């Protein structure tokens, strides 16, 4: 089949969730010998992330005219679009270029004149799209279609110690609210015996403050800058404290009990659904006045309750099996008429 064109956004204010979802799907397509190209409305750091993953990456203005022009030049088999900035009219213009369009969505808040919608949010169903798609639109809904890297499909069993020994702190690709230094201090003070693994995303501007905070804590705190194997860090942790984006699916797949923090308004649905599924405990919004107390209470409770950690781990693995990218890749190839 012809190439697949990915159109997405990323950056310090947006994060990397959209880009990482697309990279996971592109990786699954690449395994099926499908060529993939990215057209980004993003800063150089994001472009470097895509290029470093082995894909052709072009930076454009990000508007629909720019994308339509590239569609006409490339004539891709399928166009995959993922950004909260993309409106119904934007999708309509892309579809008007004559190639099937796939929308990666998790808001269910606007008409999507596309051939296929992928939404991995827990709790989403066809009724959420009744007014937003045509009967011909194929819907791939729920965590079975979570777009994760292939290593998350292969996870060993998790040992649940009586008391937690390691905590993973991860906030995604950026830290615009400077939460990580505070989070590190809070958890270190509350759980004075645990080892702390701190993940620094590629768009973190506060590395020096985080490093100074970790140095003050001592050898218990280890910094991991853009780790190549974040799955291993998740499997090595007894608890994670995480933002409410794409990382939640990875933590569920690795059966990592989690304290969730809402970093953006669009994470509400994710966090609510994951908490209802028993996969995490939600501490609140990053602007919540009593966030420190909420985080400290929850990490201590989990650290000292192995039965609750075991229940969360089982719920996570039941919800997300890590094979979503394979399923979506197969559906994209069907859409292109090659499978």
What are these regions (language model features)?
Residues 321-339:
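C-terminal alpha-helical cap of glycosyltransferases
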Residues 40, 240-242, 257-266:
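Short hydrophobic beta-strand element within catalytic cores of glycosyltransferases
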Residues 155, 161-237:
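Donor-nucleotide binding loops and adjacent catalytic segments primarily
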Residues 282, 290-307:
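C-terminal "capping" alpha-helix adjacent to the active site of nucleotide-linked donor transferases
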Residues 235-246:
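Acidic donor-binding loop of glycosyltransferase active sites
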Residues 301, 308-322:
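A short, well-ordered alpha-helix in the C-terminal region of glycosyltransferases
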Residues 6-16, 21, 25-28, 40-132:
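Active-site and donor-binding regions of nucleotide-sugar-utilizing enzymes
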Residues 113-178, 206-208:
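A nucleotide-sugar donor-handling region in carbohydrate enzymes
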């Amino acid at each position: 089949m012809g190439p697949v064109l990915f159109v997405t956004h990323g950056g310090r204010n947006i994060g990397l969730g959209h880009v990482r979802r697309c990279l996971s799907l592109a990786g699954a397509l690449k395994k099926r010998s499908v060529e993939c190209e990215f057209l980004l409305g993003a800063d150089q750091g994001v472009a470097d992330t895509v290029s470093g993953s082995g894909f052709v990456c072009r930076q454009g203005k990000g508007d629909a005219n720019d994308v339509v022009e590239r569609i006409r030049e490339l004539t891709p088999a399928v166009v995959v679009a993922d950004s909260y900035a993309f409106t119904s009219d934007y999708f309509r213009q892309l579809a008007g270029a004559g190639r099937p369009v796939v929308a990666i969505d998790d808001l269910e808040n606007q008409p999507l004149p596309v051939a296929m919608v992928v939404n991995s949010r827990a709790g989403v169903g066809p009724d959420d799209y009744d007014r937003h798609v045509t009967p011909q639109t194929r819907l791939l809904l729920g965590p079975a279609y979570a777009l994760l890297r292939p290593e998350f499909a292969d996870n060993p069993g998790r040992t649940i110690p009586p008391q937690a020994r390691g905590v993973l702190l991860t906030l995604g690709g950026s830290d615009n609210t400077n939460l990580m230094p505070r989070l590190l201090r809070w958890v270190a003070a509350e759980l004075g015996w645990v080892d702390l693994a701190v993940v620094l995303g590629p768009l973190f501007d506060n590395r020096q403050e985080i490093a100074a905070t970790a140095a003050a804590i001592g050898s218990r705190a280890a910094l991991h800058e853009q780790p190549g194997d974040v799955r291993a860090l998740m499997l090595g942790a007894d608890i994670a404290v995480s933002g409410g984006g794409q990382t939640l699916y990875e933590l569920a797949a690795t059966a990592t009990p989690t304290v969730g923090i809402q970093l953006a308004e669009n994470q509400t649905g994710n966090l609510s659904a994951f908490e209802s599924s028993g996969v995490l405990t939600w501490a609140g919004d990053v602007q919540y006045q009593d966030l420190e107390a909420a985080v400290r209470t929850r990490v201590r409770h989990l650290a000292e309750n192995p039965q609750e950690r075991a229940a969360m781990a089982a719920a996570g693995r039941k919800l997300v099996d890590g094979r979503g990218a394979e399923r979506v890749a197969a559906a994209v190839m069907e859409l292109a008429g090659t499978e």
